Amino acid sequence: MSVQAWTIFLAFLLFPVAVCGYECYVTPCTRDVIIVVDGSSSMQTSTYISQEINVITKLTYSWTLDYSKVRLALVGAYFGNEFNGLDYFTDSSLVEKRLQSFRLAAMQYGLFNGDFNTTVRFLDERYVGQRANFGPRTNVQKRIVIFTSHSGEKDIASTKNTLQKFGQLGYSVTLVGIGVSEDVYKNTYYHKFVTIQWFELGSVAQSIIDTITEEGICFLDQGWTTPKQEICTTTPTTTRAPTTTTKKSTGTVKPATTPKPVPPTHAPFPVGDYQDCSCTTQSLYIDIVFVVDVSEGMGLGGLMMVKAEINTLVGQMSLDPEIQKHVQVGLIKYSNESEIVFKPSEYTNEDEFTEDLWTDPRLEDVDEKTDEVNLHLALQQAAKMIGSMRKGVKKVVVIYAASYNDEGDDDARQIAANIRESGYEIITVAFVEPESSSLVMKIGELASPRMNFTSFRDELLVDELEDALCQVNCYCPNGWKQLVLEDRKYGECFFPTKIDASWTATKFECPILSKEHTGNGHLVYVNSALKNTFLNKFYMDHWDPENQEKPNYDIGLSYDKATQKYIWVNGVTNNPYSNWAEGHPNLSKGECVMSKQEAGTTTDFKWNSINCQTDSGRGLCQEAACDSDFYCPPN
């Protein structure tokens, strides 16, 4: 697939054939759109600018650009301390290259001071005014979308007259405020204001993209009416919108669409008050190998989206080996052959990695000479690379694939199984078009549990991938068993004590057993039937009948005389779950609690009251997992 893949999303986004107040929902959509990218020091860092560009990529990468339809002009404000604004694009492939040049300028030259007034004056001189270099088409609705982080109220207020003139000339201006509130812009003039908070910039919700599209671009200007619905003809090689035929009907006419493939179905996460693994991307301590499909099936637009996603992910991590918790990253590209692009040892700075991600000629375009792929070969290289990385550090292979072949020597299933059996995780992202539903299930076969994802080319999966990487980064100290429920890892680890002792003695033993980690170990907290079953099975698996008569274990529950309540050692008093044996609790037998195996069963345990001082047994200790909050040295 070529750059023409960019056109598909907007065809569905902008061209439904329902009669409404949005002309873009009728074929054909015609707009002249100007988008301003803020590259000033108000954006704070080049990482934020890169994320801003990712948002614009997500907004525009599938638009159908054509002189008779949508034209798009991109303005770079203060990149390299200057303004960059060329004529309207009618070729989608040039859009991403232009955005890429802005991204690189921010990384290479740094950020420069700027103001909102100068940005507006540039628009007036270059695009809007009577002497503009690049004027609009006649009888076409005109839109300006300004991404801005400027916050000087006097500076902003000084643009009111100019922006009012824009409106009088037919330009509707939408302001996308990054890290600033609409109140700062109350003294200027605009059609729509959309806010993106700094913390949202790395993974902007689709609802924000939809708002910009629908209320900033696709609405109808006053005096414009919905034109007659037309047939948009298409051939297999055109970049036009999909064919939509209007039929006589008394109801609403709907467009002919191709259903999207069903994404991999992950069961909902278990319901319960379990300790999640902490997930601070900057504090990850893992090794990552990205494996990227650059075959014709990916298309240039797809490759740029993959790079944007990798940029966003790695840009939030630390690659500095001087920092205790840091990441090593490698990258392999493949089509019918594979090639190592970045070796893990080459980068100690995330900015250097992301800059090379956009400048390395090996990642500038897809391989249009072939639509064949050999993921098996790429995974062989990935296995060798990841095996040579840091010892004792958790590792993951992240596969981005737009095509897949599971036949003959190209079958990647066995090598993927070998990677997983070596203790490494595999994340798959099926980067698909609507007709590629078979790819979803097939590429997902290679993934670790709950780590197969699907991108429909109209959204980044940053949140999902961050969570998956944090799952890789979540594990237990040596000898401890992690809580895993329905293939979801949690930040809870368990360890059985090895000698018989009273409940009170065991209570003090747990912190000692965890002293090499957090030192906050305690007798186990049982708060669901699902967790109870997990713990019973774990204890039975580690029960030594020769040294312990029965597989009973102390839990962290005891009666508090002062409050006259049962309290867990972690302070919980309102645990909704209980598992008392018949006739219990029974204070006459004691104030502490042991989980005892029911007679005639192997895995059925019930809670029994015991004497805290005289009844002896083993305990089951609980401790926090190693994750982005709690560091564990390499094993």
Curated annotation (Swiss-Prot):
Keywords: Disulfide bond, Lectin, Repeat, Secreted, Signal. GO terms for molecular function: carbohydrate binding. SUPFAM superfamilies: C-type lectin-like, vWA-like. It is found in: Secreted. Residues 489-621 form the C-type lectin domain. GO terms for cellular component: extracellular region. Residues 233-263 are annotated as: Disordered. PROSITE patterns: C_TYPE_LECTIN_2 (PS50041), VWFA (PS50234). Disulfide bonds join C592-C612. Residues 1-21 form the signal peptide. Residues 233-257 have a biased composition (Low complexity). Residues 32-215, 287-472 form the VWFA domain. CDD domains: CLECT (cd00037), vWFA (cd00198). PANTHER family: C-TYPE LECTIN (PTHR31024), C-TYPE LECTIN DOMAIN-CONTAINING PROTEIN 160 (PTHR31024:SF13). This is C-type lectin protein 160. It comes from Caenorhabditis briggsae.
